[in-house]
């Protein structure tokens, strides 16, 4: 028995033969004629001619195995040109045609009449319909990356441990020590973004939310293989660079998701955008968040609303935001971070292309999403300034003054590790219970 496609090669299967003798051998368009030595449609003829004349070079993102089909022929120009050459289209015929045309124009003695195809038969036919999605499906590697990240996002947000009354939680610890064991800063209490009562934030809640967000974010960093592969010194620097921007990206998405006109926190409290309501909030919290809130809402949350951003885009943006190369990191650390950042950027690009109607729509959406990153970085710097003032002047915020918030937010702590804090005599070794019952 003859089994269909038993002897069909991989490239033949991915690029099926034309259904008739007059079909284009490149894309299967039924209206083919002989051009440059092979049966091809006007669209592929024009594409081949322009590619050879202008010496264009293309690059395929999918191992040079893209499907070249009539409706999707414009998806990958590299594979389309390769297919043109494979079916026998002669590049020399294109070059000789151009040489002949140039010679005729220079001599001017012999008028060579060349029948031009209608304007809409080459370039217009070569356009990809706007309702055709650039990619039929994502690569399985991208699907695995996204599935893993969404699973870890859910796991970290729902990671809850019983509160240990015998344990003390402190903000007066070294950064590296806190990174290795974030549970010493705060218990992994239940995350409650969407509280029904939604109280205004207080100084006690400010302190708790800072610590719980620290623990939550470090737990999430640990889900990324690139972060786990770093040495301790690189981890410490990367946490200082990205803890605040990643946190603000997370806060913004939750404010957008739960339609809160202000900053929503992990314990269900919030800080309002409305200046009138802000008068009901304690002065320390206004000092901390007052400068940040307007930009937070106008430049980040509103952008998410306009784009109708989804959770997949948010987690990929968080990974890109976190993995920031920097000259202060080791060479190996920068290599690991740069490779990981490119991986998540490619995953985001492919995901957006899959859900968008055409390359223009996908490009616009990707640009709008990436524009969020510098804004959250600025918000992080605003918080650095606010937190330094509060951490130095408010013992209610961090117990003994200075401590972990100072080390995280102080700019000079990025450059020196040994001198980022004073002697132990300046700080009381005081452990204050953090959890607020």
UniProtKB/Swiss-Prot annotation:
GO biological process per UniProt: cell differentiation; regulation of transcription by RNA polymerase II
DNA-binding region listed in the record: 21-96
Domain called NR LBD: residue spans: 141-409
CDD domains on file: NR_DBD_HNF4A
Places the protein is found: Nucleus
GO CC terms in record: nucleus
Record carries keyword Zinc-finger: yes
Primary site of residence: nucleus
Entry keyword annotation includes Phosphoprotein: no
Name of encoding gene: nhr-100
Zn finger (NR C4-type) start-end: 24-44, 60-79
Protein name: Nuclear hormone receptor family member nhr-100
UniProt entry keywords in alphabetical sequence: DNA-binding, Metal-binding, Nucleus, Receptor, Transcription, Transcription regulation, Zinc, Zinc-finger
Function according to Swiss-Prot or TrEMBL: Orphan nuclear receptor.
Membership in a protein family: Belongs to the nuclear hormone receptor family.
A Gene Ontology molecular function term of the record: RNA polymerase II cis-regulatory region sequence-specific DNA binding
